From Swiss-Prot:
A GO term, aspect molecular function: nodal binding
Protein name (record): Cryptic protein
Signal peptide start and end residues: 1-25
Organism: Gallus gallus (Chicken)
Underlying gene: CFC1
Membrane topology, as annotated: Lipid-anchor; GPI-anchor
Main location: membrane
Length: 193
């Protein structure tokens, strides 16, 4: 009974310490953001407005002269001009939305909205049997071992894929869930006593 009070106190102190630590981290981030914003505002404040205007006019003049020299090579942009109408959530699986309609996809995905996995329905790192060969989806491509893994494979079809599930990622997820559940139950038991 006496040790349960110590566990309860230790657990409470740990939670309070984490809350304080996270709060300080957010305050530091906010201070950094404010400092960066102030620094940027000071850098962008016009110290000599005549110099800035002259620089812009020089840039425009040089652009106009280049445009006239190579007018055949340039196509005017007639695309979307109002940023309010752009769909900023057009991509899936962590893709970057470009102009509200196109996506720059991460390594293992493709398609207009990053909806297609390059290995199909096979998750990165999983082993599968494709015909007579043992294959693994690595970085978006299905890599197969060069040797035949079974006898009498000539009778099987090449397109047949049998999944061999790897337990590595699932084991990590299960352990995390069990630790969270154990922590919750320990807290519940300690508070009821």
């Amino acid at each position: 009974m006496f040790w349960r009070k110590h566990v309860r106190i230790l657990f409470t102190v740990t939670l309070i310490w984490q809350a304080i630590h996270l709060g300080k981290g957010r305050e530091k981030e906010h201070e950094k953001d404010v400092k960066n914003f102030n620094d940027t505002a000071q850098k962008q404040s016009p110290k000599n407005s005549v110099t800035i205007i002259d620089a812009f006019s020089d840039m425009n003049q040089s652009y106009q002269s280049r445009k006239q020299q190579n007018s055949r090579e340039f196509v005017p942009f007639t695309g979307i001009t109002e940023s309010k109408n752009l769909n900023r959530n057009c991509c899936q699986n962590g893709g970057t939305c470009i102009l509200g309609a196109f996506c720059a996809c991460p390594k293992h995905f493709s398609g207009r909205h990053c909806e297609l996995r390059k290995c199909g329905s096979i998750i990165h790192g999983d082993w599968v049997m494709k015909g007579c060969w043992l294959c693994r989806c690595l970085y978006g491509t299905l890599k197969c071992l060069s040797q035949n893994t079974q006898d009498g494979c000539e009778l099987r079809r090449e397109e047949e894929i049998i999944r061999l599930y790897s337990n590595g990622l699932r084991l990590q997820q299960t352990m995390s869930a069990l630790i969270c559940l154990l922590t919750f139950l320990l807290e519940l038991c300690c508070w009821q006593l």
